[in-house]
């Protein structure tokens, strides 16, 4: 199968706006290359200079990449949306298009994606690696393919940590915008009784189902394609996880308030720090108490409890 890589070179102020556009257009994955954000990690222990080009940190502009099936026609709508971005943010946006084959993508993941631990119990690993878990560890096998959600990005780590901390066993959880299915699988592995995983992207649903099957959790996790707001109306939940964008998280909060039991939790992530005040206000407006806020450079994740 062949894919189109569409990349937008622009300024950091409009990262979330363009990532949101790609998401609405049905992208099978978004990659953000931000030298300014990377420079903040340069002196940290986990920084690996081998994962970036030698001159990457010297760049001033960001590159936002998205992936679409070759036959998908999105350029006309994308260009229209980018005109609005340029006008609203007073920036320039330069577009590049390239071809990517499945085997190119897969070989790249196998080169850079390795086992790592999140929280107290969760160990994430690709299926091609062998690992003997230590006492108390819960292992998740993930082949991310071109779907968002490997556990590497801060926004995914935040939600994983919330799930690790708050899931005690027997809960019903909704995973809104499930991507690779990693959050759903984590919840089920930690004892959730039932999980509804939703995404608007066909590719994400396909990959999530494959990962659910890979982990032997098809009897607990249901993966569906469609509108999460419409689907969850009849689903009473103990927890709702939304690792998407601040815009979508804000829209989901009122719906989460309707389906969550009293004392239930909402986990929101993918929130850039400039959008946090709006998300916080929306949570409080709809009867949530902020329990925990995590931040990594510009990214924020929140765990909130319904009163």
Curated annotation (Swiss-Prot):
The keyword Mitochondrion does not apply. It catalyses: L-lysyl-[protein] + 3 S-adenosyl-L-methionine = N(6),N(6),N(6)-trimethyl-L-lysyl-[protein] + 3 S-adenosyl-L-homocysteine + 3 H(+). GO terms for molecular function: protein-lysine N-methyltransferase activity. Pfam families: PrmA. GO terms for biological process: methylation. S-adenosyl-L-methionine binds at residues 156, 177, 199, 243. GO terms for cellular component: cytoplasm. Its EC number is 2.1.1.-. Keywords: Cytoplasm, Methyltransferase, S-adenosyl-L-methionine, Transferase. The keyword S-adenosyl-L-methionine applies. It is found in: Cytoplasm. PANTHER family: ELECTRON TRANSFER FLAVOPROTEIN BETA SUBUNIT LYSINE METHYLTRANSFERASE. Methylates ribosomal protein L11. HAMAP family: Methyltr_PrmA (MF_00735). NCBIfam families: prmA (TIGR00406). Belongs to the methyltransferase superfamily. PrmA family. This is Ribosomal protein L11 methyltransferase. It comes from Syntrophomonas wolfei subsp. wolfei (strain DSM 2245B / Goettingen).
